[in-house]
Amino acid sequence: MLNFRSPETMPLVSLANAGVRRNGRWLVRGVDFSISRGEIVTLIGPNGSGKSTTAKTAIGVLKPDEGHVERLAGLKVGYVPQKLAVDWTLPLTVERLMTLTGPLKGREIEESLAATGMLHMAKAEVQHLSGGEFQRALLARAIARKPDLLVLDEPVQGVDFSGEIALYELIKQIRNRTGCGILLISHDLHIVMAETDTVVCLNGHVCCRGTPQVVSQSPEYLKLFGRRAAGALAVYSHHHDHTHLPDGRVLHADGSITESCFPGDGHHHHEEADNIHDHDPDCGCGHHARLQGYDGTEKRDA
């Protein structure tokens, strides 16, 4: 059996204090993480927090304005975009979708469609696919060239709960079979893929990081959603030592206010990845915490 998480494995991508600046404003700053073969890293955060910018910086689409990024020589990246502009008035089959980014052999198309459960839909028109089927088709296209790193930008958007579980199970199967690293982007601040090794919470900088708390620990969640969900989904709890104010400034635990927040300012010290975090009910991410209990309701502090 492959040991995907061997400490000797050289990272596919590593970011060190990386930041991107546009029009005099930092889109994201002070980002540190790495991804090795077989490892899953999930970036979470509200809209505009720098998740996609960070991912594009990691794979070389954007260059950092500070810090640095190292990538394995000859790194092959498979990418599933958050949105794909398709003219639905034009005929486009799943098979044709596979080759929009470059030519593929018939065998490569068949193998990747079969791996994502879409081989029987090869001749289907893309506009007739469900949300889950379309995401599977995009996954098939991304893995067809056997990438070292798979980047998935909001892969479960527009998919219902059961479809979300099925997609996470599929992503796990792809990782286990190929050994590729996975960088997953999600706007959901609390529910992440259970197989995630490291969760990085962004809001212009790294607010916190850690490992997900597996939902199978909660009998109430099991009762509500079943064991299949517990195997695919996990809960990530946050611990932030600061709050993002409406004007973009940052209020720190010591009462001071700064224009931004990143490790170099002397305030922010995010937790190590192996810590379990508690979530402040209004941590500044732009969302209230979904407090643990899993009774089917979302609990909010008054």
Curated annotation (Swiss-Prot):
Membrane topology: Peripheral membrane protein
Catalytic activity: Zn(2+)(out) + ATP(in) + H2O(in) = Zn(2+)(in) + ADP(in) + phosphate(in) + H(+)(in)
Family matches, as PROSITE patterns: ABC_TRANSPORTER_1 (PS00211), ABC_TRANSPORTER_2 (PS50893), ZNUC (PS51298)
A single cellular component GO annotation: plasma membrane
Keyword Phosphoprotein appears in the UniProt entry: no
Cellular localization per UniProt: Cell inner membrane
Pfam families: ABC_tran
GO biological process, one term: response to zinc ion
EC number(s) recorded for this UniProt protein: 7.2.2.20
Superkingdom classification of source: Bacteria
Keyword Nucleus assigned: no
UniProt entry keywords in alphabetical sequence: ATP-binding, Cell inner membrane, Cell membrane, Ion transport, Membrane, Nucleotide-binding, Translocase, Transport, Zinc, Zinc transport
InterPro entries with a match to the protein in the record: AAA+_ATPase, ABC_transporter-like_ATP-bd, ABC_transporter-like_CS, Metal_Ion_Import_ABC, P-loop_NTPase
Residues the record lists as binding ATP: 45-52
First-level EC class: translocase
Every ABC transporter domain range: 13-228
Subunit relationships: The complex is composed of two ATP-binding proteins (ZnuC), two transmembrane proteins (ZnuB) and a solute-binding protein (ZnuA).
PANTHER family: METAL TRANSPORT SYSTEM ATP-BINDING PROTEIN TM_0124-RELATED, ZINC IMPORT ATP-BINDING PROTEIN ZNUC
Purpose of the protein: Part of the ABC transporter complex ZnuABC involved in zinc import. Responsible for energy coupling to the transport system.
Family to which the UniProt record says this protein belongs: Belongs to the ABC transporter superfamily. Zinc importer (TC 3.A.1.15.5) family.
Protein name per the record: Zinc import ATP-binding protein ZnuC
Source organism of the structure: Rhizobium meliloti (strain 1021) (Ensifer meliloti)
